[in-house]
């Protein structure tokens, strides 16, 4: 199985991810690396060019990495941030079309890749300012809502996504994730 931690910024995804460093392939910092190497705009400043690069990079990673891994972000996150920034993207109509195209692309991808498990990490504590991620709580809540709405939409169309909500302390979250991974036979 392939595992994706998904949720708004500052919910503890990277903290959870690093508990698996020595047990499986870890995919992290994709967006930060693109921002550093290509200068793309992210968070509230995200634009069509940057979101397109992020989508393409994640599709490349997901399509070409078939071995077991865990990632601290996924396409659900990219769709959510894109929805948040739609009003800032060129013309509203063009932004809406772009999002619809990306959701359809995600649906097609999901139908062909049923070996992905999503761990949804909701907002349970304040975001820490690390100098990169947005600390705007309203933006954060919007990102979180968009992810939940996307999962609800996917469920409504019968997508069959494997989604688990993971809450609690870091230890409780890890226990939940590890139990699910054990059920899939991926860790002992």
Where are these predicted regions, by residue range?
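Glycine-rich phosphate-binding loop used to anchor ATP phosphates in small-molecule kinases
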Residues: 49-113
């Amino acid at each position: 199985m392939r595992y994706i931690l998904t949720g708004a910024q500052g919910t503890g995804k990277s903290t959870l991810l690093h508990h698996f460093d020595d047990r499986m392939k870890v995919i992290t910092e994709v967006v930060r690396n693109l921002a550093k190497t290509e200068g793309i705009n992210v968070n509230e400043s995200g634009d069509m060019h940057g979101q397109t690069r992020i989508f393409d990079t994640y599709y490349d990673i997901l399509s070409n990495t078939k071995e077991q891994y865990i990632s601290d972000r996924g396409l659900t996150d990219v769709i959510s941030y894109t929805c948040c920034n739609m009003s800032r993207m060129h013309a509203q109509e063009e932004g809406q079309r772009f999002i619809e195209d990306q959701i359809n692309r995600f649906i097609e991808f999901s139908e062909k890749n049923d070996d992905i498990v999503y761990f949804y990490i909701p907002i349970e504590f304040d975001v820490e300012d690390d100098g990169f991620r947005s600390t705007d709580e309203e933006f954060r809540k919007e990102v979180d809502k968009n992810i939940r709405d996307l999962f609800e939409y996917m469920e409504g169309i019968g997508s069959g996504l494997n989604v688990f909500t993971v809450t609690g302390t870091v230890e409780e979250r890890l226990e939940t994730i590890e139990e699910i991974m054990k059920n899939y036979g991926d860790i002992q």
